Swiss-Prot record:
Provenance organism: Mycobacterium sp. (strain KMS)
Function statement: Catalyzes the methylthiolation of N6-(dimethylallyl)adenosine (i(6)A), leading to the formation of 2-methylthio-N6-(dimethylallyl)adenosine (ms(2)i(6)A) at position 37 in tRNAs that read codons beginning with uridine.
Protein name: tRNA-2-methylthio-N(6)-dimethylallyladenosine synthase
Designated gene of the protein: miaB
All copies of domain Radical SAM core, residue ranges: 157-404
Cofactor: [4Fe-4S] cluster
């Protein structure tokens, strides 16, 4: 009798789902791809591991742009090796650009890895994990071209209030320092209706802000994933008609979505930046007054060697036209120091363009030699000491400009979308963080808004996803400070969702079996039967 009851209890217990963790390296594209990986795994029955807990499946979504990305990945894989030996049932998967580049080399350097999948194989991850577990052998799947636009895949979004929306994947440019086109393939664009439908789905779940993603958003319209010629052969991109006004039209269409309060995009290419985009930014109220436009170098000679297809004069002209149309626009950029053959004169040209551009901030990088790129074989590779010294001078100039630009914000009233986990805050002041419409990070005092009656102030605690207005009281190079009382506080559905721990979901399921929940294991009771 006891044995029968015990067995019935064991059978009644639900199976324990396997847990997962996704570790992301690199750009916003990878961050969004990781949301898709999470969505796929959850649709297949896995559940996210608790913070600090060891996951049954660890997925690395990798970057191949810089050398330290390689070192970071293989270092982390080495740290997991002892656990893999002691817990052979746990699984390790490596995906993303580095997996696409290194392929079988991942298994040679880390033979304890279970799955290696490429940038075009995101949707295969749950199946590959199950196959590796069943066959007890590593699985490698690297496709050479995009077969299905990844935004059709389910995605478990990280934020309740802001979402990434891909408008294209791949790149048709041939920058000599960049390995991305060889890993992500030629550009393939989504149809506007598909993009807008995904945005609407996010807004319906309370999302207030979207960022449109593409390697070169200005080239949007060069091809469309739904074009029949691309379905037959993805290499046919050159023969697909292009709508050069498609991106500006897409921005304006975003302006017609009720409830969508903020639209951002990244990254445009200066060579294809057209005035219709500037006009759309200026005339569409929910398009944020912010522009991130990579410069890379201020030297025309180096830009030519980089194959960047524009020169410093054109770049500065775009900035002038943006600021004429949108006076309060915050402009940010990417810069590379120490490209092969860069002379002191070339570097000074970069400093001159940076000084003239008055960037709000800049992502600055020391040139990193990447095997497989034309720049890796160029003569004139610079000594590390020279690159480091120039890098420091560039940092000092941009830090001064960033501080001056932020100091000019003191006294202004800004609308903030309250965020979570943004930057360093002073715990003693209990500040929260938010992003202004121009993208600046603001640490603010979360005191009750002046327009709120006392009876509501306890209820109206500020939450990530809410919208507040406040006055800037201080500045640093990388953030603003607002220590006065809030002027207004608007509770939002995004704030409700964040407080409830809800995450937006997009994409469609693929009919993947629920492999994350294995058959129930035998239960040992207190009677040890």
């Amino acid at each position: 009798m006891t044995s029968t009851v015990t067995q019935q209890a064991a059978n009644a217990l639900p199976p324990v789902a396997r847990t997962y963790q996704v570790r992301t390296y690199g750009c916003q594209m990878n961050v969004h791809d990781s949301e898709r990986l999470a969505g796929l795994l959850e649709d297949a029955g896995y559940r996210r591991a608790a913070d600090g807990a060891d996951a049954d499946v660890v997925v690395f979504n990798t970057c191949a742009v810089r050398e330290n990305a390689d070192n970071k990945l293989y270092g982390n894989l080495s740290h997991l090796a002892p656990r893999k030996r002691s817990e052979p049932q746990m699984q390790i998967a490596v995906g993303g650009c580095l997996a696409q580049k290194d392929r079988d080399a991942v298994l040679r350097r880390a033979p304890w890895v279970d799955v290696v999948f490429g940038t075009h194989n995101i949707g295969s991850l749950p199946t590959l994990l199950e196959r590796a577990r069943h066959n007890r052998a590593a699985q490698v799947e690297i496709a050479e071209a995009l077969q299905e636009f990844p935004s059709t895949l389910p995605a478990a979004r990280e934020s309740a209030y802001a979402g990434w929306v891909s408008i294209s994947v791949g790149c048709n440019n041939t920058c000599t320092f960049c390995i991305v086109p060889s890993l992500r393939g030629k550009e393939v664009d989504r149809r506007p209706g598909d993009v807008l439908a995904e945005i609407q789905t996010l807004v319906d779940q309370g999302v207030l802000e979207v960022t449109l993603l593409g390697q070169n958003v200005n080239a949007y319209g060069v091809s469309f994933a739904a074009d029949e010629r691309l379905r037959e052969d993805p290499r046919m991109w050159q023969s697909v008609p292009r709508n050069r006004g498609a991106f500006a039209e897409l921005l304006r269409a975003c302006g017609r979505i009720d409830g969508l309060e903020r639209v951002r995009f990244t990254s445009p290419h200066p060579a294809e930046f057209t005035d219709d985009v500037i006009e759309a930014m200026a005339e569409t109220p929910n398009v944020c007054p912010a522009l991130h436009m990579p410069l890379q170098s201020g030297s025309d000679r180096i830009l030519r060697a980089m194959r960047r297809s524009y020169r410093a004069e054109k770049y500065l002209g775009i900035i002038d036209r943006v600021r004429a149309a949108i006076p309060d626009a915050a402009i940010t950029t990417d810069l590379i120091v120490g490209f092969p053959g860069e002379t002191e004169e070339d570097f000074q040209a970069t400093l001159d363009v940076v000084a003239a551009s008055r960037f709000s901030s800049a992502f600055t990088f020391q040139y990193s030699k990447r095997p497989g790129t034309p720049a890796a074989d160029m003569p004139g590779q610079l000594p590390k000491a020279v690159v480091s010294e120039r890098y420091q001078r560039l940092i000092e100039l941009q830090e001064r400009i960033s501080l001056e630009e932020n100091q000019a914000q003191v006294g202004r009233t800004l609308e903030l979308l309250v965020a979570t986990g943004e930057g360093r805050k002073d715990a003693a002041t209990a500040r929260l963080s938010g992003r202004a419409r121009d993208g600046r990070l603001v640490h603010f005092a979360p005191g009750a808004a002046a327009d709120e009656p006392l009876a509501r102030r306890a209820f109206d605690q500020v939450r990530p996803g809410d919208v507040v207005t406040t006055t800037v009281t201080g500045a640093a190079p990388h953030h603003l400070i607002a220590d006065g009382a809030l002027l207004t506080h608007r509770r939002t559905r995004a704030g409700d969702a964040h407080a409830a721990g809800l995450r937006p979901r997009t994409g469609v399921g693929l009919g993947i079996p629920g492999v994350g929940a294995p058959a129930p294991a035998p239960v040992t009771t207190g009677c040890a039967l």
